[in-house]
Amino acid sequence: MDRIHITGGAPLQGEIPISGAKNAALPLMIASLLTGETVELANVPRLADIASLLRILGNHGVDHMVVGKRPGQTSETGQTIRLTASNVIDTTAPYELVSTMRASFWVVAPLLARFGEAKVSMPGGCAIGTRPVDLLLMALERLGASIEIDGGYVVARTRNGLRGAEIVFPKVTVGGTHVALMAAALAQGTSVIENAAREPEVVDLAACLTKMGARIEGVGTPRIVVEGVSRLGGARHEVLPDRIETGTYAMAVAMTGGDVILRDTRAELLHSALDVLATTGTEVTALPDGIRVRRNGAGVAAVDVTTDPFPGFPTDLQAQFMALMTRARGQSRIRETIFENRFMHVQELARLGARIRLDGDLAVVDGVERLKGAPVMATDLRASVSLVIAGLAAEGETTINRVYHLDRGFEALEAKLGRCGAQIRRERA
């Protein structure tokens, strides 16, 4: 199993290109099942989760072809993928494939909407809380699907197609909104999605569906209206920049000091996180084609933060921000409101010398003067990159084990950091 070795202490200097967002690319790829025509997606990151989803789509009979890159992308970053679901041979998504990644469960929506049936294994993947699929299935039932659980599989059917309906989510759910959008796009009549997620990745999916012929209004607000159509066509769409990768590298710069320009990204995708970062004393400047992050002199100030759905502070940046706060001046209180069991990184940060106390959904972080390198173990995707951030500032060497988590969500991480002066290397098993 691969390991990453980091010798801390070097400030980051230079430029980092931001990849396409995995959390946008996955639902966009799944949406290709809604049509028999070709959907071409540009700026798709090269990640383990992308490869896993291509295998799942291939199992259904979807053809895919990698056709090129965007100008400026290197051999290790970015790709353009053409997906054609003109010969879907199977509407079953088996356990051995779905268990590798939670988002693959979303194939239930386009399979059901287009073919009238889907049999999809209950999901696996990330170990963050329970993440139930109840809200996703509720949305499909509201649209007229019959749902059964049989032997660990969700069996969804509709006799005469899905029909437009009002879907009211009791809490904001990104996955539920993705599923509702895809299913409602081919439903008969009008669907109204209340308490819809407003995340940029939801907006990106709706933009692609619109190019395919869907009729969608209100995306980016809590109320989305979808007028169903009888068929969708092909489209070309570029995946939006990864706001979580953007925030991660911004926090790495704040942690180590230095001056880095994050290219190919947009500040409006993560205003809340950048505002919090600025409050710590880090200089954040929006540029026409990116963001400049700079911190010189004194360390960062302690800041309290609470995770919230977009446009609030992203839960996917909570672990990274906690790593930054381990060396802040004073005490920081970090409250996690989205997922339970999302403090698994705390124990590993403590191995580096961090002082963190947990009380339910609250983490209290007392900043320390220095961290010291040690062997640590990644427990999930965001926790693993928080250890990278801490390791970049720790004295001596930090060895991160189980880095396959990183490969699920961060494209060419060692290369991007290394080009900015980080002493980081991968030891391959």
UniProtKB/Swiss-Prot annotation:
The gene is murA. One of its GO terms (biological process) is cell wall organization. Belongs to the EPSP synthase family. MurA subfamily. CDD domains: UdpNAET. UDP-N-acetyl-alpha-D-glucosamine binds at R102, R131, P132, V133, D134, L135, D316, I338. This is UDP-N-acetylglucosamine 1-carboxyvinyltransferase. One of its GO terms (cellular component) is cytoplasm. It comes from the Bacteria. The active site is at C126. The modification 2-(S-cysteinyl)pyruvic acid O-phosphothioketal is found at C126.
